[in-house]
Amino acid sequence: IGTACELYSDSEGVYGERIMPEHIDRESFLFNSPFIHGSMMFRREVFRCHRYRTLGKNRKYEDYDLFMRLCADGYKSANLTDKLYCFYYDKALRAVSFSMRCDEYKVRMECFRMLGLMPKGIIYALKPILLGFIPRRATMKIKEKTNKV
């Protein structure tokens, strides 16, 4: 189970929020991870069968990878709509390298297959790579207008 959060930075203090979907199904993973990693709580038994995979392709995306594998294995998950977590998010420091975008693409392709989301998932798997071609300033404006910061 996860929760919504407030966003804050040193320069702005609390400046926004992220409200995550309450009910999660396999399609919830297509656009982005439907969870705020730091807010997640698990039953201990989950980690008897599943672990974070940190080799190669999923560096920085091990949480997204784990959440999708758990969903593929039939585990149920949800988010509380209450903002019970504060997340430090400095917009100025949020650059993503092209190699990281490629890593996310690989994780998405593998896990979307496990979730039975292909061929629909191909477009969503390409999202991180396609975003790499859009100027950073433009993506930040889009995020601000859609409250996705």
Where do the PLM segments sit?
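Juxtamembrane helix-loop transition sites at the ends of transmembrane segments
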Residues: 57, 109, 134-137
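Terminal low-complexity segments of carbohydrate-biosynthetic enzymes
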Residues: 129-149
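Flexible domain-boundary/linker segments
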Residues: 17-18, 64, 87, 121-125, ...
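Catalytic core of nucleotide-sugar-dependent glycosyltransferases
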Residues: 87, 94-118
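Short beta-strand segments
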Residues: 2-4
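Conserved nucleotide-sugar donor-binding catalytic segment
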Residues: 6-11, 16-99
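Membrane-interacting alpha-helical segments
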Residues: 102-105, 116-123, 127-135
